Amino acid sequence: MVPRVIGMIHLAALPGSPQYGGDFAAVVDAAVSDAKVLETAGFEGLMIENFGDVPFYADDVPKATVAAMTHAIGRVGDAVSLPLGVNVLRNDAAAALAVAASTGAAFIRVNVLSGVMYTDQGPIIGRAAEIARMRAALAPNVAVMADVFVKHAAPPPGITIEQAAEELAGRALADAVIVSGTSTGRPPTLPLLRK
């Protein structure tokens, strides 16, 4: 089951990231604190992502990032009783699935699951076939939530949002489709949601 009201936990810069402050315990403690606040506020689930790791790798983060996220998400899971989600930015769905499998997280977010999007990391190509097979083998109970026309990106010409959403649900096997605005903090418009 994918929660409908999900609180977001943005991890501060992790070890190996350019803006890492050198205190990993503080990063984890902040995530745990945020999780407790969001649980008390009534959120149905929590999504945890490495938001502080700018600039992002396109689709293959360092192993240190995977290890740090696994530890942080494990600690958050020990502190709250909500279903957890994992997003490894910018688009490392394989790492997100591995972290989810090892921490017991319920779902992952994939910014580009199918097709291609043009981002500040360059073109990112979805790997739905690889992720579907990895999920079947490693974590069949982990839900995949996928963005359609993800924020901070542009689709190729000629592709409509309706087409992309149908492909995500029908052919890429996404369990849920996420519609975001054009950038973080800018929600999608009502006409876009109606499409």
Predicted regions and their residues:
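Extreme N-terminal starter segment of soluble prokaryotic enzymes
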Residues: 1-5
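Alpha/beta enzyme core
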Residues: 6, 11-60, 67-83, 91-195
